[in-house]
Amino acid sequence: MRKIVAMAVICLTAASGLTSAYAAQLADDEAGLRIRLKNELRRADKPSAGAGRDIYAWVQGGLLDFNSGYYSNIIGVEGGAYYVYKLGARADMSTRWYLDGDKSFGFALGAVKIKPSENSLLKLGRFGTDYSYGSLPYRIPLMAGSSQRTLPTVSEGALGYWALTPNIDLWGMWRSRVFLWTDSTTGIRDEGVYNSQTGKYDKHRARSFLAASWHDDTSRYSLGASVQKDVSNQIQSILEKSIPLDPNYTLKGELLGFYAQLEGLSRNTSQPNETALVSGQLTWNAPWGSVFGSGGYLRHAMNGAVVDTDIGYPFSLSLDRNREGMQSWQLGVNYRLTPQFTLTFAPIVTRGYESSKRDVRIEGTGILGGMNYRVSEGPLQGMNFFLAADKGREKRDGSTLGDRLNYWDVKMSIQYDFMLK
């Protein structure tokens, strides 16, 4: 399998000299092949990570996705080959899930698509479930991942969709195996019970999802739930509303609610077995860019290998937002110098506790700066450059990590898409 994926990446590299399509996306109902090359560099000092505080990874990702459209308007196939190649890493530094330890890695995927009617769809096999990557049309509660690394979220099992009316969507998924952005050391792995002693999911338990979404031209309200024996029961809601202020200005509000309860073998007598999170964001959009404010509150922190609670709107490369009793608040501005070049400036404040004992208080402040440039014409049309730098500081009186923690983080990404139809 690794040889097959590696050969695909060689083909991707050869294609990088060809003309790129701007914002290339595969349409579900047409045949196509998308090639994505993504070069990423991460260098950081994250003292809250303990022995893994020094972070360095430089990688080249090659991602190939193909889609057949539908034969007789009923059945089709989709698939891909993803690979992350190591360009730079050091044995004495963490690669923070960009690599398999300090090694290259990859995998392939493929699924059969069945369209019983124009308003329904069934997928069987291994398929993408990452809305940021374009695998799903929007952020479906609990089902949709948003990978923070080179490769997107992938699920193995069955996915179903039914447009009940033009405004109401129903989604269901049964997932036996999964790849999340923290699974670089395992690749596609079984869903199941996490063993903190071995760092593996050694008891296989499939996970079932159900979600519904109502939408119109300015709103989307979605609700989803999942059940997984011996792991957790979860529920999530996502509410989005845009208000036109005049032809050139809009106000958008977003609100996320989340609740999780551990079940069976995942329950712990010394730690909280349930948690809740609420987070929201308000964005004012103007011709020159946008101004936004966001906030979030997490009741109890949980092991991210069991329940992912890092899903709120405030964002920082350095500071944790998913600690015990954590509040996080952020203000920011995106300023568009040209239609292609955008600058971002976003300070953040956090308040919470280091553990469920609540004996060490965390008071964090940080600032994020970033720039994004997209090539809009010429042979490199569609190439996207992203650079972000983050500086943070936490006060943790009495912590074994130190009373004052200083953070810095730099992330760079260059992405290039090429489409064949």
UniProtKB/Swiss-Prot annotation:
Gene Ontology molecular functions: porin activity
Record keywords: Cell outer membrane, Ion transport, Membrane, Porin, Signal, Sugar transport, Transmembrane, Transmembrane beta strand, Transport
Primary location: membrane
Record's signal peptide: 1-23
Compartments where located: Cell outer membrane
Annotated function: Enhances the activity of the UidB (GusB) glucuronide transporter, on its own however it has no transport activity. Glucuronide transport does not occur in strain K12 due to a variant at position 100 of the UidB (GusB, AC P0CE44, AC P0CE45) protein.
Family, similarity comment: Belongs to the outer membrane porin (Opr) (TC 1.B.25) family.
Protein name in the entry: Membrane-associated protein UidC
